[in-house]
């Protein structure tokens, strides 16, 4: 989207019955200034943005039921007349719109939370359709935040002369598009119809051979069927066609970006069987397992290949990724070049230095750690040693990206928890050298389909078994009212000489004034959100007054963070109250108990990583997930999955299945790369197909400029421009 603000075209232009996909939506009928601003809030500026804004749900009126016969606890679609519309304000910043809908058999109440504009869209005597889970309370059937559609209205809309006295839709299947204030699903359906009529038959950007190969709809048919389906099956086939377009564009963008990163750079052929590699392996306190050795050999093989390495090393907590990465660092040292290890937090960077540093020293490899707390004198010394080549390995955070950090010859970049860094940050680290091999690591196991959607052309190594699993962790769900049990477990553990964590979603009490996100099934735990500072102040003076407590948050100065963690590692602190700053990398084997407040506020990845902080030694760990998430809710199902399994790979699949969206286990594509149509769970086959097609296309036409693929290249650039910013497409 190149425009930043909407400009309204003259009326004579807006009533034109023909327009192109790149035209502003203001050329369409019915789009006045207010509607244009409302569409802009949905990210819709052009006609193509509108047509690719696909419905997130369909109301199937062939299966609607009367109110009295709607089954409690089941999803249902009902229609009826609005008998009343009420606005309630139970507390500041909380608005609830409550409507009563009646039909010949009974009454149903529907409540909408934090959507005040609904009172302007639904009026008394309107005929509406509601779709959602049927509940029962106070003698009435109820729905909470259901999908709704105004089928006919009793009140004209002064903002839109065409709305007055709409007639009920005769369609058996109605699309429900994402809505915002000023844009109801009903109005979206009308403007979508106008857009399809005004654009006519659009030119297909997908080569015809791919349409035939994958048995896809034409683009024009897909746009018609996804918005006004003849059947639910046709709607799904249309969505899959548009999803394939999106996924192929993403794969082409990822490959183009990688080709750009590596353009003009020759891979460096590392020495992989030198004395430092052998010395480091001998210095390890354990023998590499078959899986670890296999992963190490894959990495070393890449480091001598005629292609610059782009490898992702996946392994759950405790699988030994660190040892494998250390072998690669030693290979760079054997080659008389340099390696950089970049971690997302100073705590994790320090952890790597403490774990790997002594092994490197035993192998005769020089190394240093640089973070935000590094003194200026020490920083200058590190910079000098990097510049003259006397320093082989450096550990750090994004401080490594500073212009002051100049390497004599950087040939290996190791990036931990790569999804936490933006594309530009990873590229910036690689630009510190020529033909730099990239090894990305993650303790968050992700399905191959997600790896492809995040990284594109990436080789993957997986370590699935823990050589030293520790005593294990038991995960328990509890409601906040029963936290006494968790506190008792902490007291017992500390008295036995162990340590504990208390993890909160927020830092300060003032942050807890924020409202919950508008997501399905979100709940407010006990009417409040727990903050680390409040929990520390209250519990350290009451329940845990006889123990030594400390506080760790991301807002502390780097030096203070290091000091707090060092005291905890030395068992000078018995209970650590923190935020998710301890999520990855913190290794304190003596910690055995953890309580996570407002657990439903965290992603599965974060919770899985957090519980990996306990039970790492010879004593079993216990994690209490405190939440008021309702039984049957998505939040409760996700927490129950953690209670039932410790298999990270299985959790990744479960999370993908539950979410059905472009984010799983904490991974969210950044900036302009979010998937809007594709379902990473349902479209696994399309992701694989798009990846293979993208490889074949870029092999023939790397820059996507030939007659066969120029249109496709422009489409990919339009969707994922962040990856093409330096490729010169217009």
Positions of the model-derived regions?
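N-terminal cationic and glycine-rich segments that engage phosphates or anionic surfaces
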Residues: 144-146, 153-154, 428-430, 440, ...
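Inter-lobe coupling/hinge segments of SF2-like helicase ATPases
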Residues: 262, 294-297, 307-640, 703, ...
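Upstream accessory/linker segments immediately N-terminal to the RecA-like ATPase cores of bacterial MutS
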Residues: 35, 88-283
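Intrinsically disordered, low-complexity N-terminal extensions of nucleic-acid-metabolism proteins
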Residues: 1-18, 74-89, 94
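Accessory helical-bundle/CTD segments and flexible terminal tails appended to RecA-like ATPase motors
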Residues: 566-589, 594, 612, 616-629, ...
């Amino acid at each position: 989207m190149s425009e930043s603000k909407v400009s309204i075209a003259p009326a004579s232009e807006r009533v034109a019955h023909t327009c192109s996909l790149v035209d502003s939506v203001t050329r369409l009928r019915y789009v006045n200034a207010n509607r244009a601003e409302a569409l802009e809030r949905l990210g819709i500026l052009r006609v193509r943005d509108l047509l690719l804004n696909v419905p997130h749900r369909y109301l199937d009126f062939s299966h609607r039921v009367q109110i009295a016969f709607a089954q409690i606890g089941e999803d249902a679609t009902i229609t009826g007349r609005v008998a009343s519309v009420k606005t309630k304000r139970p507390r500041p910043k909380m608005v609830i719109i409550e409507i009563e809908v009646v039909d010949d058999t009974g009454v149903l109440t529907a409540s909408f939370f934090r959507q005040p504009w609904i009172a302007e869209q639904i009026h008394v005597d309107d005929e509406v359709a509601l779709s959602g889970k049927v509940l029962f309370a106070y003698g009435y059937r109820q729905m909470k935040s259901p999908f709704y559609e105004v089928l006919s209205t009793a009140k004209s809309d002064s903002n839109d002369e065409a709305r007055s006295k709409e007639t009920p839709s005769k369609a058996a299947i109605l699309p429900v598009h994402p809505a915002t204030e000023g844009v109801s699903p009903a109005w979206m359906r009308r403007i979508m119809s106008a857009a399809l009529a005004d654009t006519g038959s659009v030119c297909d950007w997908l080569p015809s051979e791919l349409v035939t190969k994958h048995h896809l709809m034409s683009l024009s048919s897909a746009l018609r069927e996804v918005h006004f389906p003849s059947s639910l099956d046709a709607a799904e086939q249309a969505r899959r066609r548009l999803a394939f377009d999106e996924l192929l564009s993403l794969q082409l963008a990822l490959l183009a970006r990688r080709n750009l990163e590596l353009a003009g750079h020759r891979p460096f052929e590392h020495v992989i069987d030198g004395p430092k590699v052998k010395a480091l392996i001998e210095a390890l306190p354990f023998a590499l397992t078959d899986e670890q050795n296999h992963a190490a050999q894959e990495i070393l093989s890449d480091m001598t290949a005629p292609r610059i390495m782009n490898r992702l090393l996946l392994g759950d907590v405790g699988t030994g990724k660190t040892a494998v990465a250390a072998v690669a660092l030693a290979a760079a040292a054997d080659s008389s070049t340099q390696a950089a290890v970049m971690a997302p937090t100073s705590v994790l960077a320090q952890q790597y230095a403490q774990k790997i540093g002594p092994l490197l020293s035993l192998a005769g490899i020089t190394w240093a750690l640089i973070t935000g707390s590094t003194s200026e004198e020490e920083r200058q010394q590190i910079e000098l040693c990097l510049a003259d080549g006397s320093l082989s390995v450096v550990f750090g955070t994004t401080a490594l990206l500073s212009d002051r950090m100049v390497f004599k010859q950087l040939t290996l970049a190791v990036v931990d928890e790569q999804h936490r860094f933006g594309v530009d940050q990873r590229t910036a680290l690689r630009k510190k050298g020529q033909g730099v091999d990239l090894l990305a690591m993650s303790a968050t196991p992700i399905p191959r389909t997600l790896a492809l959607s995040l990284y594109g052309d990436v080789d993957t190594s997986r370590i699935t078994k823990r050589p030293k699993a520790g005593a294990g962790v038991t995960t328990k769900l509890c409601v906040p009212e029963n936290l006494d049990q968790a506190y008792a477990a902490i007291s017992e553990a500390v008295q036995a000489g162990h340590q504990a964590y208390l993890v909160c979603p927020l830092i300060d009490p003032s942050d807890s004034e924020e409202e919950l996100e508008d997501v399905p099934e979100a709940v407010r735990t006990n009417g409040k959100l727990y903050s680390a500072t409040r929990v520390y102040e209250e519990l350290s003076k009451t329940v845990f007054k006889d123990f030594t407590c400390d506080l760790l948050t991301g807002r502390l100065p780097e030096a203070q963070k290091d000091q707090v963690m060092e005291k905890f590692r030395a068992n000078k602190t018995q209970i650590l109250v923190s935020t998710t700053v301890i999520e990855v990398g913190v290794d304190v084997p003596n910690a055995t108990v953890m309580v996570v407040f407002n657990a439903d506020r965290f992603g599965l990845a974060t919770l899985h990583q957090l519980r990996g902080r306990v039970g790492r030694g010879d004593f079993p760990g216990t994690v209490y997930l405190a939440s008021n998430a309702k039984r049957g809710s998505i939040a409760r199902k996700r927490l129950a999955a953690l209670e039932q399994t410790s298999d990270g790979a299985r959790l990744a699949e479960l999370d993908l299945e539950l979410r059905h969206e472009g984010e799983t286990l904490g991974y969210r594509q950044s900036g302009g790369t979010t998937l809007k149509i594709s379902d990473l769970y349902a479209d696994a086959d399309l992701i694989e197909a798009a990846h293979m097609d993208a490889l074949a296309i870029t092999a023939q036409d790397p820059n996507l400029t030939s007659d066969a693929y120029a249109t496709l290249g422009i489409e990919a650039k339009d969707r994922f421009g962040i990856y093409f910013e330096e490729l010169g497409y217009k």
